[in-house]
Amino acid sequence: MSNTPRTVVVAAGLAAALSTGAEATFHLMQIEQVIGGVNGDVTAQAVQLRMRTGLQNLLGGARLWVRDATGSNRILVMNFTAGVPVGLAGRRVLITSPGFNSTTSPSAVPDFTMTNLIPASYLAAGTLTFEDNLGIFVYWRLSWGGAAYTGPNDGDICNDPDGEFGPPWPGPLPSAGVQALQFQGTAAAASSNNADDYALTSGSSEWVNNALGVFLLESPCPWDCGDSDGEVGIVDFLALLGEWGVVGGSCDFDGGGTGITDFLALLGNWGPCP
């Protein structure tokens, strides 16, 4: 007869059951895309999650938290009380603030509305975490601000093999234009580190909800055609020259092919976007 105490056997079995259940609920998830503001309006924010495998749509046990540059003073961004209908690999979950929805074309239809905004003071440096409700597991972490972020970068190994999501993305969380900070890997990809895994979207950012609705965040300043950073400048000028003669390019403002009219329009709107 085994000498293993019954309580140990029961505990081990319970742990295995919980682990198996978690794999088919929500934890194999990326923080795919984040924007901290639109054209300087920091009340217009969005977070897009992406499922790494199927059966990750039972979100009722998950939360999104944001913390400041020291990894402290956490704010609840999203308390998920329900899941989303479709749990196929690669499907998204769109979480927005009310101020974000009218900035896209068509107006965004989110899966969830943010519980709280990411504070403006956290945009320079901070960390966003996708966790379980009990705060035991950090399933995904996105930190930004480079050396200005001094908090932890650790997380669960289910999405990052070494459990270390750092170093952080070197810049701030974007808020000046229409660019978002976006994970560059495939839907199935695990994290390597935030600095290498993330990049700003090129130009306008695209947002997708669980039902595959697509919402384009367009710039009200079309002359900011090179980097969508909220200012018409040298990068936009070089982008225009690089697509000279191209019809339908990002700097073809009149639709007749990038040329002298577009060049003059860009120069006439040089500087910060309105």
Language-model segments: what does each one mean?
Residues 64, 78, 93-95, 128, ...:
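Hydrophobic beta-strand residues in large extracellular and virion-surface proteins
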Residues 17-21:
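N-terminal signal peptide c-region/cleavage motif recognized by signal peptidases
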